[in-house]
A protein has these predicted regions:
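N-terminal [4Fe-4S]-dependent radical SAM core
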Residues: 1-53, 59-76, 89-97
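Auxiliary Fe-S-binding modules of radical SAM enzymes
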Residues: 1-41, 197-270
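Structural preference for long, well-ordered alpha-helical segments within the folded cores
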Residues: 60-63, 114-117, 121, 261
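Short glycine-enriched, charge-decorated loop/helix-capping segments at active-site entrances
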Residues: 68-72, 165-171, 239-247
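Short cysteine/histidine-rich metal-coordination sites, predominantly Zn2+-binding motifs
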Residues: 75-85
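Short, conserved loop/turn and helix-capping segments at secondary-structure boundaries
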Residues: 77, 169-172, 249-252
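Conserved AdoMet/S-adenosylmethionine-binding subsite of the radical SAM
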Residues: 88-100, 105, 109-236
Length: 270
């Protein structure tokens, strides 16, 4: 039995008629549920980008800074045609700045048809495209879907199955299988690893991620992202138990040590 206030309480923050994220399809090809968007991103792909944050996610990461994206109707219903028109308004500036569109979440692959349509439109507008994903639902993205994705920002949260499950509530293998498939497709990838003291910072855990990633020729970068507390107020607002309230941000020395493990395994890391 899931307790109210648990990160697995699917009722928290949802509209009463919200569909389950796991099985929602509906008219996804014509509308979707968007949490928000922002312009001016310079860290989520090359150039200056527009970031679209979709609603819906099946992971329940202990350090999630956007728990308000977990459920579809926590976002705003938006017509795909309207989203494409808005993207078109930004396209000339994005092209001029060598940027493009990055779709994040939540988990974009929950809303497969909507994000497929948005990526396709971005390519027709001459924009670079990036998918920011945990890879947990990577099996849903067929090769045609990935053909419209220029770069995958793949969040590998742990190399150890038990640590991964503790951090996310889900299994590690789907993410690893998706990573292997992206490598087979020679799809450019930036691996992202969140360094959380006391959770993911064990050198053995980092080494497992590094050894898995190092042989993959498609991985352009491994990015070590320091844990932060910036999303804790959202957990509090939603009435969710936040288990990492006493977890510090990693020191520069801890980040450097993690980077050295990745570099020592042969990864390009930053």
């Amino acid at each position: 039995m899931v307790e109210v206030g648990s990160r697995f309480d699917l009722r928290t923050g949802r509209s009463p008629d919200a569909p389950e994220t796991a099985g929602f399809e509906g008219n996804e090809a014509t509308f979707g549920w968007m949490h928000s968007y922002e312009t001016g991103s310079t860290v989520d792909g090359p150039g200056v980008r527009i970031m679209v944050f979709m609603s819906g996610c099946l992971l329940r990461c202990l350090y999630c800074h956007n728990p308000d994206t977990w459920h579809l109707k926590d976002g705003v219903r938006i017509e795909l045609a309207h989203a494409i028109r808005r993207l078109g308004d930004f396209a000339p500036a994005l092209r001029a700045m060598g940027g493009g569109l990055t779709i994040s979440g939540g988990e974009p692959l929950v809303q497969l048809a909507f994000t497929r349509g948005l990526f396709g439109a971005a390519k027709r507008l001459g924009l670079h495209t990036a998918l920011d994903t945990s890879g947990f639902l990577g099996h849903r993205a067929d090769d045609d879907y990935l053909a419209d994705v220029d770069l995958v920002l793949l969040d590998i949260k742990s190399g150890d199955p038990d640590t991964f499950h503790k951090a996310t509530g889900q299994d590690l293998q789907p993410t690893l299988r998706f990573a292997e498939r992206l490598n087979a497709l020679s799809k450019p990838v930036w691996v992202r690893f969140v360094l959380v003291p006391g959770l993911t910072d064990d050198p053995v855990n980092i080494e497992k991620v590094a050894r898995f990633v190092a042989p993959m020729k498609n991985v352009e970068w491994v990015e070590v992202l320091p844990f932060h507390q910036m999303g804790v107020f959202k957990w509090q607002t939603l009435g969710l138990e936040y288990q990492l309230s006493n977890t510090p941000t990693p020191t520069d020395a801890q980040v450097s040590a993690a980077l050295e493990i990745f570099r020592g395994a042969g990864c390009r890391a930053r």
